[in-house]
Amino acid sequence: VLIDMGLKGKRIGVIGENRYEWEIAYLSIVCGTGTVVPLDKSLPENELRSLIERSEIEAIFYTKKYEESLKKILEEKVGKLKYLISMENEEQELIKKGEQLIKQGNREFIDAKIDNEKMNIMLFTSGTTSASKIVALSHKNLVSNLMDISSILDVNSDDVFLSFLPIHHVFE
């Protein structure tokens, strides 16, 4: 659906509390749509505005807490921002639309070719000593991290992991 919206190869932000829908949004972007830009949920509106502009985000998945600020930023025509996608209700609609596209024979997302050297994750440093900086990661960086950890840990379907860190700042 994101590809159908014209977001193939574009930068798409994700902001919100740690939750299942955050991960679904993240993976739907990074696994064949474009570049994911995880955003710090604790940023004040002016810093959020700055990151949206600097990263050239065209769409953002968000939770209800950020709706008012993001609508204001969208109305102000900040950067390239065009779409706001709520994790509260629109995500289910997007999934249904995606299923319809697949039934109609659209396999653009399923058959997406991923360039493992191309940047598809854009992180921002916390900016504790100065303005936050962009860290560009490729799909290869991501997969290498997973392969390394799986060679150390014996993970199976019975395992449970607890994360208390903000999800935008870590990959677990």
Please annotate each region the language model reported:
Residues 1-43:
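Conserved AMP-binding/adenylate-forming
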